[in-house]
């Protein structure tokens, strides 16, 4: 989530928030509290992975914010699966694949 003076800046901050490491928190205590409130609230809905139901719908919520004028507020939200944006796969000459960033995943199974 990005919160800023304009929607353009909010969109940029939202992308920055999406790329933060999972489990990190905003340095601002109020923003960190809002991250936790949003994460708990979204998980309480019970959507689960891919909307199939379950206890957890999100792995985390990150908020990046900047100073803004009280009369305007730009908010942008980026959503993305962690596995879609972080990973490194190595192929050998026989096209065997190894995911060195996710050691528990066997791509050749």
Write out the residue ranges for each language-model feature.
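Non-transmembrane, aqueous-exposed alpha-helical and coiled segments at domain scale
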Residues: 3-109
């Amino acid at each position: 989530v990005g919160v800023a003076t304009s929607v353009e800046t909010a969109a940029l901050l939202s992308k920055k928030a999406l790329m933060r490491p999972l489990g990190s928190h905003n340095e601002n205590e109020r923003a960190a509290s809002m991250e936790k409130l949003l994460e708990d609230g979204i998980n309480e809905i019970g959507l689960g992975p891919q909307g199939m139901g379950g206890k957890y719908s999100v792995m985390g919520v990150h908020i990046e914010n900047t100073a803004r004028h009280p009369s305007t507020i730009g908010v942008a939200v980026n959503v993305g699966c962690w596995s879609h944006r972080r990973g490194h796969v190595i192929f050998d000459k026989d096209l065997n694949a190894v995911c060195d960033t996710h050691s528990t995943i066997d791509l050749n199974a």
